[in-house]
Amino acid sequence: MEQTNVRRGGVLLHITSLPGPECAGTLGEAAYRFVDFLQSAGMRIWQVLPVGPTGYGESPYQSACALAGNPYMIDLALLQKDGYLPDYQPAPHAETGRADFETLRAEKEPWLRRAYQHSRDRLLSDGAFEVWQKQWPWLRDYALFMALKQKFNQV
């Protein structure tokens, strides 16, 4: 029987607080390095704040959907490495020690759209998208909601 009262060490750090070339941390190379560091330090737990799309004031606690992931945490360099974004060139940023969500949104949205446009045919042709839609039935309604929200200026 496994003991449930064993002490474990850990850290609370939101993904956007990780270092990296973008205006906020992502689930990319820095996240992998951080997990390796935690393991080497004997830590067993990494607790993060909610990772859904942020709401008013970029609060992770005011998400429009508890099931969706925040697209700004997608690492564009990994999309490039996997062939979804072959022409990606990261914009240079001064290290300020603070996440800049306004700049992040302005820079990242066009790249994410470009990755989709570049890979759309491949993603739709292999049948995985249909399987994915069946596994996640809430996705269609959420996508419609977000499209309408954007169309009507985030109202």
Where are these regions (language model features)?
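Acidic/aromatic-lined carbohydrate-recognition and catalytic surfaces
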Residues: 2-155
